[in-house]
Amino acid sequence: MSNGRILHTMLRVGDLDKSIKFYTEVMGMQLLRTNENKEYEYTLAFVGYGDESQGAVIELTYNWGKTEYDLGTAFGHIAIGVDDIYATCDAIKAAGGNVTREAGPVKGGTTHIAFVKDPDGYMIELIQNKQASAGLEG
């Protein structure tokens, strides 16, 4: 399966409009497409930084009438590479986003990271782009 690629990550959300607004207006993504299933009572919205054929996106799943989920302890976070982590955090805060860990070096290392929380409590790690492809280096 060496020719596979990650297509999307699915997050269950309690308020689809609020989540779309967060990912588009706060995180700077585009709403790529939506799909409503009346028979099974759910709506999907796909958001990302570009066309789905070029990279992974986020699938926001809204199950009609369900406003809250127990996130549990298994899921960690989504990671996004950014060009200027400090300016990105400032822009997120200015747009009303919740930066839970300010930008700075990872403990014991030099990679610069920050964390943001989305409206449903999912964590998003921001990694300075020049360091994102290398992972978390010391």
Curated annotation (Swiss-Prot):
Binding-site residues, Ni(2+): 8, 59, 77, 125
BP-aspect Gene Ontology terms: methylglyoxal catabolic process to D-lactate via S-lactoyl-glutathione
Binding positions for substrate per the UniProt entry: 12, 63, 77
Lineage of producing organism: Bacteria, Pseudomonadati, Pseudomonadota, Gammaproteobacteria, Vibrionales
Sequence similarity: Belongs to the glyoxalase I family.
The keyword Lyase is annotated on this UniProt entry: yes
Protein name: Probable lactoylglutathione lyase
Pathway: Secondary metabolite metabolism; methylglyoxal degradation; (R)-lactate from methylglyoxal: step 1/2
PROSITE patterns tied to this protein: GLYOXALASE_I_1, GLYOXALASE_I_2, VOC
Species name: Vibrio parahaemolyticus serotype O3:K6 (strain RIMD 2210633)
Residues covered by the VOC domain: 5-129
Note on cofactor: Binds 1 nickel ion per subunit.
Swiss-Prot/TrEMBL keywords: Lyase, Metal-binding, Nickel
SUPFAM superfamilies xref list: Glyoxalase/Bleomycin resistance protein/Dihydroxybiphenyl dioxygenase
Cofactor(s) needed by this chain: Ni(2+)
Documented EC number(s): 4.4.1.5
Active-site residues, as the UniProt record annotates them: 125 (proton donor/acceptor)
Highest taxon, organism lineage: Bacteria
Reaction(s) catalysed (UniProt annotation): (R)-S-lactoylglutathione = methylglyoxal + glutathione
Top-level class of the enzyme under EC nomenclature: lyase
GO molecular function ontology, one term from the record: lactoylglutathione lyase activity
GO cellular component term of the entry, any: cytoplasm
Function of the protein: Catalyzes the conversion of hemimercaptal, formed from methylglyoxal and glutathione, to S-lactoylglutathione.
Pfam families: Glyoxalase (PF00903)
Record-linked CDD domains: GlxI_Ni (cd16358)
